[in-house]
Amino acid sequence: MTHQQPFIAVIPARLASTRLPNKPLADLGGKPMVVRVAERAREAGAQQVLVASDAQSVLDAARDHGFEAVLTRADHPSGTDRLAEVAATFGWSDDTVVVNVQGDEPLIDPMLVRDVASHLAAHPDCAIATAAHPIHDAADVFNPNVVKVALDARNVAMYFSRAPIPWSRDAYLPHWPDVATMPPPAFPVHRHIGLYAYRARFLRTYPSLAQAPVEQAEQLEQLRAMWHGERIAVLITEHAPEAGIDTPADLARVQALFRPGSK
């Protein structure tokens, strides 16, 4: 059983989105999306819930619903960089656990948020903890929008990739390059869940780390930490989380769930 770890939840929320403008303020059952996410973080038991944004309208929406909000710079290349600014602003102690709850995940399971924080506390040799779940469909394995993680014997990440990892030579080569005929994986393949817990001392060093070639190639910010020698503990959950909101179709799907009478 995992120990209940005290933690702070930070919700980075960018107003600019190419596929879904003003996404943090999208209405979900009478409340902005960013507020729905903050409510989930509060349900997870966070000691403090902070919304971090470069847009005053997002900060106002959070404060109007009783949540703390902090203004951040507009030029951050990633959510982790935004969290690093918040950590520097508040001066949290080195061992403070800070969980990055994505601002477009209004259906995130509060228990998963809590468990990832506890997972970091259980791995003092790791700077970051995250989560993953098994996938069994070849279409997911070969989908570049599904990020996979390869794990060592302790479930510490060895690599994250949009490519199919681990690559099953004997199973896949006879079908390559016809992805449609690929068999389901006969070995554990894990999909990364974009939920992170950090130690505050790592967040303070993150902005000084040069971007890594693999980070730029894969467009995966967690690879910067690994490139510079940091370890990432991965919590395995058997339950796939609800999908986040990236497109108008995603928004319509989730809005339907928040309508009165929906289940």
Swiss-Prot record:
It is an enzyme of class 2 (transferase). It is found in: Cytoplasm. GO terms for biological process: CMP-keto-3-deoxy-D-manno-octulosonic acid biosynthetic process; lipopolysaccharide biosynthetic process. GO terms for molecular function: 3-deoxy-manno-octulosonate cytidylyltransferase activity. Its main location: cytoplasm. Pathway: Nucleotide-sugar biosynthesis; CMP-3-deoxy-D-manno-octulosonate biosynthesis; CMP-3-deoxy-D-manno-octulosonate from 3-deoxy-D-manno-octulosonate and CTP: step 1/1; Bacterial outer membrane biogenesis; lipopolysaccharide biosynthesis. Pfam families: CTP_transf_3. Disulfide bonds: none annotated. Keywords: Cytoplasm, Lipopolysaccharide biosynthesis, Nucleotidyltransferase, Transferase. The keyword Cytoplasm applies. GO terms for cellular component: cytosol. SUPFAM superfamilies: Nucleotide-diphospho-sugar transferases (SSF53448). It comes from the Bacteria. It catalyses: 3-deoxy-alpha-D-manno-oct-2-ulosonate + CTP = CMP-3-deoxy-beta-D-manno-octulosonate + diphosphate. The keyword Nucleotide-binding does not apply. Its EC number is 2.7.7.38. InterPro entries: Cytidylyl_trans (IPR003329), KdsB (IPR004528), Nucleotide-diphossugar_trans (IPR029044). Activates KDO (a required 8-carbon sugar) for incorporation into bacterial lipopolysaccharide in Gram-negative bacteria. Belongs to the KdsB family. This is 3-deoxy-manno-octulosonate cytidylyltransferase 1. It comes from Burkholderia ambifaria (strain MC40-6). The gene is kdsB1.
